[in-house]
């Protein structure tokens, strides 16, 4: 979110060893550079996250998944530069939309899914993968045939069967075995063009301009919300700012606590009141990713909050215009102004990414394997918040 009109799409392309992932990615990059020259595109390999001196590159334990999650988060937040564990660094432009292709064995682990714009699994049967393995490692790289076959049988194939193949069900698109590469390229290329069209549409129609300082504080809230999402928590987070200083922050804990009242705003308020008098809220501004609910809006009013900035509306429980306008009621406590639409599209997509995934802690868990993440974001109706 370094630039409020810049969008990042992260495409995870997973599959087993020698399934054709890298070849697909390289040809997709060529097509992107010719068909969308104004879009920045880059390929990242999961092997960049191998622990030093790893012996078995096929084992999940050989990869620094936590470091990988941090890089995914930085890309999602619009970082200008990312550095990988292998020592390489990548500069990301802030004046172009970005499509980042990532290929690797373990991209579709449950904790990584929220970061991807699209998830693809390249499937090939064991015989085809073995044939490619021999051709590449023996013929091209002059490897020892006996060792190559032993590695495939004792390391590569067991890892695929037990840990890689099961993640296939998390993919949005599965490219079937023996499929002609040109057909796969055409299909995935069109898919990327659709994603680009949505990125361009939302970036041009859903921008609400605010001062850079307000954007800085909201970015802090979004960083916490993205972390919450990766931990399967409702991605609503906030920061309270008093005279230019962040004095409190919070994120929803409704899932982990199984309590419907552990909202970001209330958690942050509790922490603030441990160190400051209640009178501090008269000069404090709240930045929250989603419109405060009825309960939180009322609490903010009782504390005489100075102002509230939020990203997207809360169509079911909003207390600042979407359902009720508690912030405007002057019958008991003073009213407070609200400023919606700060990183609106990003806030909408965070919530969609949460609700499209399985939530085993929901009161009535529902299977969501067939749900598709919608990318079109309608323009925000600002009139209801005036």
UniProtKB/Swiss-Prot annotation:
Signal peptide: none annotated. The keyword tRNA processing applies. The active site is at residue 265. Residues 212-322 form the CMP/dCMP-type deaminase domain. GO terms for biological process: nucleobase-containing compound metabolic process; tRNA wobble adenosine to inosine editing. Keywords: Hydrolase, Metal-binding, tRNA processing, Zinc. This is tRNA-specific adenosine deaminase subunit tad2. It comes from Schizosaccharomyces pombe (strain 972 / ATCC 24843).
